[in-house]
Amino acid sequence: MEGRYKDYRIRFSPGWVEVVQDDVTVPSRRALITGATGLLGRAVYKEFKENSWHVLGCGYSRARPRFECLNLLDEAAVKALIQDFKPHVIIHCAAERRPDIVESQPELASLLNVVASENLAKVAAGVGAFLIYVSSDYVFDGTSPPYREDSIPHPLNLYGKTKLDGERAVLQNNEGAAVLRVPVMYGDVEKLSESAVTILFDKVQFSNKSANLDHCQQRFPTHVKDVATVCLQLTERKIQDPSIKGIYHWSGNEQMTKYEIACAMADAFNLPSSHLRPITDEPVGATPRPWNPQLDCSKLEKMGIGQRTPFRVGIRETLWPFLVDKRWRQTVFH
């Protein structure tokens, strides 16, 4: 579905100037992406854009020229933007996702993860937009995996609690909304520290120094482009079937500790891994994290929804621009 509008451009020639009117075709399906400047948000923005949606991306601290600068804590601004753009779907990617930061700044984290999500749910319901709230596997304590959508949540840390409270606020204020729980993600990062997965790469590359890595807590690293695909598929299914709502799970299916993730990175680039040391003791003084919050994704799988990128394939594509050994990069990729 597409719409047309008039656009104007100025054509310059020697001795004269002409104003030219063009017909411009734009998709009539509209998607609003919050947190569009973040790792997941960028992938979701790209996925909808490449599938003929008219996409408006919002950011705040990292807002850029092509994105709308929007403070999600400003209720009036959020309402005005949504009522003006009239999106068919809102993918709510914006969140404070770092557990340690949430513990140190609980009030601010609660405002963004809970209060802003509640307000967004209300406004989305008011304009009839389908809302997908991206949540986390940290709503579970990790003691009895795998977890289904109807498993009883029990977050161990404040981050997990704010995401769970955000889920409840969304579903209580927008009965047609969906919650998509996902695990730790990686993808086309702007810097290695943007993902809890890719941040390990420096420890892998600098093999002249031993590195201690957790070999206890289980993780399921998931590519953001796979999550973006699920968001698009779920949205397009909603258009056909209004009963699509409630909680869904999506996750990569390769189980790894941080130590195993680092070893897989080393293997992907033929780098040494003997300097990587597995630590099986529980971290002392760290923010508590679930041991194994594996998500059961069979609900979406039975619907024919989902995509999984093999970890070694995805991590190689993600990390090669950050290789210190440029000669290796040029040899393999060019």
Curated annotation (Swiss-Prot):
It holds the Pfam family RmlD_sub_bind. It comes from the Eukaryota. One of its GO terms (biological process) is one-carbon metabolic process. One of its GO terms (molecular function) is methionine adenosyltransferase regulator activity. Keywords: NADP, One-carbon metabolism. Heterotrimer; composed of a catalytic mat2a homodimer that binds one regulatory mat2b chain. Heterohexamer; composed of a central, catalytic mat2a homotetramer flanked on either side by a regulatory mat2b chain. NADP binding increases the affinity for mat2a. Belongs to the dTDP-4-dehydrorhamnose reductase family. MAT2B subfamily. Regulatory subunit of S-adenosylmethionine synthetase 2, an enzyme that catalyzes the formation of S-adenosylmethionine from methionine and ATP. Regulates MAT2A catalytic activity by changing its kinetic properties, increasing its affinity for L-methionine. Can bind NADP (in vitro). This is Methionine adenosyltransferase 2 subunit beta. It comes from Xenopus laevis.
